[in-house]
Curated annotation (Swiss-Prot):
The modification Isoleucine amide is found at I14. Expressed by the venom gland. It comes from Polistes rothneyi (Rothney's paper wasp). Belongs to the MCD family. Mastoparan subfamily. GO terms for cellular component: extracellular region; membrane; other organism cell membrane. Keywords: Amidation, Cytolysis, G-protein coupled receptor impairing toxin, Mast cell degranulation, Membrane, Secreted, Target cell membrane, Target membrane, Toxin. This is Polistes mastoparan-R1. GO terms for molecular function: toxin activity. GO terms for biological process: killing of cells of another organism. Coiled coil: none annotated. The lineage of its organism: Eukaryota, Metazoa, Ecdysozoa, Arthropoda, Hexapoda. It is found in: Secreted; Target cell membrane. Mast cell degranulating peptide with high potency of histamine release (EC(50)=0.09 uM on rat mast cells). Also shows high hemolytic activity (24% sheep erythrocytes lysis at 50 mM). Its mast cell degranulation activity may be related to the activation of G-protein coupled receptors in mast cells as well as interaction with other proteins located in cell endosomal membranes in the mast cells.
């Protein structure tokens, strides 16, 4: 799991 990509997606959703 790419946490950087996942985190960026979450931040973008907020």
């Amino acid at each position: 799991i790419n946490w950087l990509k996942l985190g960026k997606k979450i931040l973008g959703a907020i």
